[in-house]
């Protein structure tokens, strides 16, 4: 399963929200430095969707705010 995520690093609030266009917006406290925000995004997806982190990977957009996430079955 693949889906698009918009990330808001350095956020005061942490949230996981589905948008009308089918994408997901995730706000994390971690900065977009050295992959910290990416790790937080994977942790947030894992917690919200109740799937192991090892099954989640960022397919594209590792250095941008718009990312494509893939979840292995």
UniProtKB/Swiss-Prot annotation:
A Pfam cross-reference name: DUF167
Spell out the InterPro entries in the cross-references. DUF167, YggU-like_sf
| Superkingdom to which the source organism belongs | Bacteria
Recorded GO CC terms: cytoplasm
Kindly list the residue ranges recorded as spanning the membrane.
Answer: none
Q: Which SUPFAM superfamilies match?
A: YggU-like
Protein family membership: Belongs to the UPF0235 family.
- The identity of this protein, by name, is UPF0235 protein LBJ_1240
Q: Which organism is it from?
A: Leptospira borgpetersenii serovar Hardjo-bovis (strain JB197)
Q: What is the lineage of its organism?
A: Bacteria, Pseudomonadati, Spirochaetota, Spirochaetia, Leptospirales
